């Protein structure tokens, strides 16, 4: 690798380090990929998990600035994941956005102190970006 390539690679690494990091948790592969690309285009670095258990491990191992999670997943629901994060000293202040389908509107209407925001699927890129920006200003 020549000096120009090294400089570009190092600049990319430094830029990624300055981006806020979102832990994305979604069991549907195509939805996860769509959300991952959407978040990256909004300027976020993304760590993706396919279920709540994987997300727990990633949250403990990586510094994260926000969590975007599906409500219904195998092994651990989005709300169970949120409660786990709120009970962890290091992670309790991380904003959590719960994504829910139309069929699960009850989850969004029930009071839950562990969730900062609810968005309905299919979520629009601008809606997600605006929600995360608002939560980051609050914290």
What do the PLM-derived regions correspond to, one by one?
Residues 62-68:
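Active-site beta3 strand of CheY-like receiver
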Residues 73:
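Receiver (REC) domain active-site loop signature in two-component systems and cognate sites
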Residues 33-41:
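Charged docking surfaces used in two-component/phosphorelay signaling
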Residues 43-50, 58:
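Short hydrophobic/Thr-rich beta-strand motif most characteristic of the beta2 strand and flanking loop
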Residues 70, 100:
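Active-site residues of response regulator receiver
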Residues 26:
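Conserved acidic carboxylate
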Residues 1-21, 124-139:
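Non-catalytic signal-transmission and effector/linker regions of two-component phosphorelay proteins
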């Amino acid at each position: 690798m020549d000096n120009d390539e090294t400089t570009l690679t190092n600049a990319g690494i430094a830029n990624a380090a300055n981006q806020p990091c979102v832990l994305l948790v979604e069991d549907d592969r195509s939805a996860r990929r769509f959300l991952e690309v959407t978040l990256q285009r909004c300027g976020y670095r993304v760590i993706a998990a396919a279920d709540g258990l994987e997300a727990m491990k990633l949250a403990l191992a990586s510094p994260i600035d926000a969590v975007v999670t599906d409500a219904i997943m195998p092994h651990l629901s989005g709300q169970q994941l949120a409660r786990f994060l709120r009970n962890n000293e290091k992670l309790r202040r991380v904003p959590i956005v719960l994504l829910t389908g139309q069929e699960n509107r009850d989850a969004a209407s029930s009071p839950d102190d562990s969730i900062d925001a609810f968005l309905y699927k299919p979520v629009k890129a601008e809606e997600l970006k605006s929600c995360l920006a608002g939560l980051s200003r609050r914290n």
